[in-house]
UniProtKB/Swiss-Prot annotation:
Pathway: Pyrimidine metabolism; dUMP biosynthesis; dUMP from dCTP (dUTP route): step 2/2. This is Deoxyuridine 5'-triphosphate nucleotidohydrolase. It comes from Gamma-proteobacterium EBAC31A08. HAMAP family: dUTPase_bact. InterPro entries: dUTPase, dUTPase-like, dUTPase-like_sf, dUTPase_trimeric. One of its GO terms (biological process) is dUTP catabolic process. It is an enzyme of class 3 (hydrolase).
């Protein structure tokens, strides 16, 4: 792993996401309406339970070509130690070609807070209360 395709990197100084590249031996045609696991050529282990990695779509592939992740967002826990794969989903009506080395997703490293829960009889009152979807308005 990691010898054919460069390791993930930030494309610009302001990039939040590391680009993940398709580690393929040849071009792959992702048929319209289908998904396929794409190897990205490396394994990782974060180790620190205060961190996790999230794999998310690249905005241009999603908005211009309909290529997103089959699981929408991938969460990589700090104790995972295996090879990473990207579940690419072609939600368009046109086949899409993925070439070896193409940037197909991005990964961000995020802090994690593991919450402790407790049972309570009632909550402190707030202005919003139980008002749900759309209750805070749009303007």
């Amino acid at each position: 792993m990691g010898s054919k395709i460069p390791l993930p990197q930030y494309e610009t100084k302001g990039s939040a996401g590391l680009d993940l590249r398709a580690c393929l031996d040849s071009n792959l045609s992702l048929q319209a309406g289908t998904s396929q696991l794409i190897p990205i050529g490396f394994a990782m282990y974060l180790e620190d339970p205060g961190l996790a990695a999230m794999v998310i779509p690249r905005s241009g592939l999603g908005s211009k070509h309909g290529i997103v992740l089959g699981n929408l967002v991938g969460l990589i826990d700090s104790d995972y130690q295996g090879e990473l794969m990207v579940p690419a989903w072609n939600r368009s009506d046109t086949d899409f070609e993925i070439n070896p080395g193409d940037r197909i997703a991005q990964m961000i490293i995020v802090p994690v807070i593991q919450a402790d829960f407790e049972i309570v009889d009632e909550f402190n009152e707030t202005q919003r209360g139980e008002k749900g979807f759309g209750s805070s308005g749009i303007n």
